[in-house]
């Protein structure tokens, strides 16, 4: 009898097979005398669509809403059904005695495996592999400490409740809004509050009125002393009068105070912090950061589990620090890492805190030494950031003397503040940091002359627009960006981690860009006309970050066995009914900002102009019509003059190709040029290359020229 190991991806299955010496490769799995290891391809099973409950629901109609199934159905995803059949056969195989779930150690990973097992009707015992890295050592250690699968039942119930709630709310709210206003509009418990966050910030900026104010400083022996005052001076004349009173008046050093202080490194990275820093440093978006991090985790095995919300490590990891430091010796930080090899680490260090680690600890290097030449430029940047933060956390604090010199002149107090580094500590890892020396020439009681007075003009600045990094942080801490009626709600938002999860926030932002609810201009995220109208048309409670936080709080309670999933789902059903009825009874109107005067050839309604990756197209405003029409698109045909790609306008014989250089030619001329160029002889390789490149494009001249050739 054998144990069947179910991994989430083929790459992880290969890692497990390698770690456990499961060497016999089969079709869709690996095998040895003790284990069989197979894999999902992400989700193999998903929630059924409305039309899979009732074929009449394929057409979107307002009168059919709300759609609330008595029992939720799941279906096998068509494109991965072959692998599902393989997994199913293995689960039901008589030689398999039990199942070891080895999907990602988290809510979504649990759902991936359990949906498959439930769909198959598994009755065999379940064990759980729960690890935070996929190195050979971590896998082998994890298999020595397999858990009873029943310990994770509540995690599964929470994952299933989240999935079903999102389906019930999302399907109904989106269909209701879309059919009510004849527009492709989408609502969701996470995406709609995120639009509201961006909109609130945008309104704050638009309503901001800058205020002018002034500051005064004195220069003494080359040092600038700032006027100490509890008020902001908005009247320049007040400071000018003060300057007049200071003329020909000497000052006196009232005190020189030195206080020794320490500063400590930032917390270890969680996913959100890492995504934010990658955008701040390199303008790399959250989605790209997560994909790169996943590659470092799965392919290179040099970092721990990516989707974590913790900034801390567990105390049982203390003994692993040395081998992780050893791995970082391959980086440019080897000189800073080397002294740490002789240091003794204690579980009392601030980075170790079991209470602040739930599913996964902070993102840190594994014990695997990276082959730096194998890392892409983006992977290298990300790995360096993780190593830098990790080594800083293990280094001594930065120490400095905070010097405060107080000057009195004509009854006014001016202050000079300087920090003098005495011990670099963790800051030694940063380029350009060094020990500083300040030969400050002041002693208490000194009489000093003022060499210069400076009145500086300032202006208050509005809040900054969100970028992809700061929006992530706002989703994590929305209580810092919105006004709440009750302070207790701020605590709720803080405890639940805000809107969405570390694993989903990047996807939500990406989705909002794709549905044209938000846009980024020069790195500034703004709400589009469509996004603003979604907020106006959506039920008010669905735009609030508080509601989704309260839901997330209940999901966490389900995960901990303190709330019934069934109760939560019933609450979501009642909420959905209210949302749908509210939309049905609304008298608000939706105005397309991209509506054209072109009539749809199918239904006669006016069409909407939308941007695509390669150009523009017209789409019928009625979502049930689905008529589309190309307006313009980039082709692979090249301009004969400047060799740039030509843009195709129109269709059929009316089509025209234009270039940015001014060149233009008709479809007939293009056909003739391509035919002449080919001379009736085209290699099979060239034909395949162009046919694949232009697959699905209408009016493709090269494709047309090739299709009748006999090869």
Curated annotation (Swiss-Prot):
The record marks 60, 167, 175, 307 as: Interaction with DNA. Residues 186-191 are annotated as: Interaction with DNA. The keyword Isomerase applies. CDD domains: TOP1Ac (cd00186), TOPRIM_TopoIA_TopoIII (cd03362). Signal peptide: none annotated. Its cofactor is Mg(2+). It is an enzyme of class 5 (isomerase). Belongs to the type IA topoisomerase family. This is DNA topoisomerase 3. It comes from Staphylococcus aureus (strain USA300). The gene is topB.
């Amino acid at each position: 009898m054998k144990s069947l190991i179910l991994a989430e991806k083929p790459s992880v299955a290969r890692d497990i097979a390698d770690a456990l010496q499961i060497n016999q490769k089969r079709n869709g799995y690996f095998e040895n005398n003790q284990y069989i290891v197979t894999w999902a391809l992400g989700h193999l099973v998903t929630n059924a669509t409305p039309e899979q409950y009732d074929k009449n629901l394929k057409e979107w109609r307002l009168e059919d809403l709300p759609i609330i199934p008595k029992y939720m159905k799941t279906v096998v995803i068509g494109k991965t059904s072959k692998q599902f059949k393989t997994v199913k056969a293995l689960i039901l195989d008589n030689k398999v005695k039990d199942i070891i779930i080895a999907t990602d150690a988290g809510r979504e990973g649990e759902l991936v495996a359990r949906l498959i097992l439930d769909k198959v009707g598994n009755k065999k015992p379940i064990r759980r592999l729960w690890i935070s890295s996929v190195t050979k050592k971590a896998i082998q250690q994890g298999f020595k400490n397999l858990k009873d699968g029943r310990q994770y039942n509540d995690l599964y119930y929470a994952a299933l409740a989240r999935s079903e709630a999102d389906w019930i709310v999302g399907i109904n709210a989106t269909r209701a809004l879309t059919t009510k206003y004849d527009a492709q509009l989408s609502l969701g418990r996470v995406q709609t509050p995120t639009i509201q966050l961006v909109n609130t910030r945008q309104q704050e900026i638009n309503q901001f009125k800058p205020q002018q104010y002034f500051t005064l400083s004195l220069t003494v022996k080359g040092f600038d002393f700032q006027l100490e005052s509890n008020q902001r001076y908005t009247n320049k004349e007040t400071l000018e009068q003060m300057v007049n009173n200071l003329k020909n008046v000497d000052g006196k050093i009232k005190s020189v105070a030195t206080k020794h202080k320490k500063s400590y490194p930032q917390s270890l990275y969680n996913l959100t912090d890492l995504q934010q820093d990658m955008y701040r440093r390199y303008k790399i978006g959250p989605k790209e950061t997560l994909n790169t991090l996943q590659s470092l985790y799965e392919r290179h095995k040099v970092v721990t589990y990516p989707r974590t919300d913790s900034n801390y490590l567990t105390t049982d990891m203390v003994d692993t620090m040395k081998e992780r430091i050893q791995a970082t010796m391959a980086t440019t930080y080897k000189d800073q890492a080397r002294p740490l090899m002789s240091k003794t680490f204690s579980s009392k260090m601030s980075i170790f805190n079991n209470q602040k680690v739930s599913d996964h600890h902070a993102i840190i290097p594994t014990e695997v030494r990276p082959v730096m030449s194998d890392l892409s430029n983006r992977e290298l940047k990300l790995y360096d950031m993780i190593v830098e933060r990790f080594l800083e956390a293990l280094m001594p604090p930065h120490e400095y003397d905070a010097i405060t010199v107080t000057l009195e002149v004509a009854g006014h107090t001016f202050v000079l503040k300087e920090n003098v580094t005495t011990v670099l500590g963790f800051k030694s890892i940063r380029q350009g940091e060094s020990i500083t020396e300040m030969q400050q020439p002041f002693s208490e009681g000194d009489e000093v002359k003022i060499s210069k007075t400076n009145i500086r003009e300032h202006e208050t600045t509005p809040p900054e627009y969100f970028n992809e990094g700061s929006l992530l942080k706002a989703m994590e801490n929305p209580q810092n960006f919105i006004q709440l009626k009750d302070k207790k709600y701020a605590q709720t938002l803080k405890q639940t981690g805000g809107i969405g999860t570390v694993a989903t926030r990047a996807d939500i932002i990406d989705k909002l860009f794709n549905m044209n609810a938000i846009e980024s201009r020069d790195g500034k995220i703004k709400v589009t006309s469509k996004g603003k109208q979604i907020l106006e048309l959506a039920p008010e409670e669905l735009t609030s970050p508080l509601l989704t936080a309260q839901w997330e709080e209940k999901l966490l309670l389900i995960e901990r066995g303190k709330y019934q999933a069934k109760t939560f789902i019933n609450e979501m059903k009642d909420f959905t009914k209210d949302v749908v009825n509210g939309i049905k009874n609304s008298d608000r109107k939706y105005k397309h900002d991209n509506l054209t005067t072109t009539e749809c050839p199918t239904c006669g309604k006016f069409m909407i102009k939308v941007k695509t990756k390669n150009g523009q197209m017209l789409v019928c405003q009625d979502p049930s019509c689905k008529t589309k029409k190309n307006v313009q698109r980039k082709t692979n045909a090249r301009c004969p003059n400047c060799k740039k790609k030509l843009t195709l306008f129109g269709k059929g014989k009316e089509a025209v190709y234009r270039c940015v250089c001014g060149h233009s030619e008709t479809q007939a001329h293009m056909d003739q040029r391509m035919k002449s160029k080919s001379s009736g002889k085209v290699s099979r390789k060239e034909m395949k290359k162009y046919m694949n490149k232009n697959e699905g494009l209408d009016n493709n001249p090269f494709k047309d020229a090739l299709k009748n050739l006999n090869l």
